[in-house]
Swiss-Prot record:
Pfam families: KOW (PF00467), Ribosomal_L27e (PF01777). Gene3D superfamilies: 2.30.30.770. One of its GO terms (molecular function) is structural constituent of ribosome. The gene is rpl27. GO terms for biological process: erythrocyte differentiation; translation. This is Large ribosomal subunit protein eL27.
Length: 136
């Protein structure tokens, strides 16, 4: 069977705090490592989705409603459901990597990087489906 968990692939988080959230694989580790002897992936996703915006709203209200809260986390493949979709959001690999979990300051920086990139993509209007809450 081919490897389908690749960077850029959109996945659904199935378990834990971020269950039901959409995320993008930043780095996949199919064979596991010494500290995590199972296949896992570093993902970055949306914790709080942007709210609905209408034409009658002012600039301030639109700006406030267009905010996104991001997360960066390592998940076991068992807790991710891959979709057929891919998103090419260029996250900086030097900032968003597995080393960020050692230091809270680095983790904040990584979350900030993800947030900025997600908001940038949201404002261009591409991949609209990615920025909408999954209804289930």
């Amino acid at each position: 069977m081919g490897k389908f968990m690749k960077p850029g692939k959109v996945v659904m988080v199935l378990a834990g705090r971020y269950a039901g959230r959409k995320a993008v694989i930043v780095k996949n580790i199919d064979d596991g490592t010494a500290d995590r002897p199972y296949s896992h992936a570093l993902v970055s996703g949306i914790d709080r989705y942007p709210r609905k915006v209408t034409a009658t709203m002012g600039k301030k209200k639109v700006a406030k409603r267009s905010k996104i809260k991001a997360f960066v986390k390592v998940f076991n493949y068992n807790h991710l459901m891959p979709t057929r979709y891919s998103v090419d959001i260029p996250l900086d690999k030097t900032i968003v990597n597995k080393d960020v979990f050692r230091d809270p300051a680095l983790k904040r920086k990584a979350r900030r990087e993800a947030k900025v990139k997600f908001e940038e993509r949201y404002k261009t209007g591409k991949n609209k489906w990615f920025f909408q809450k999954l209804r289930f």
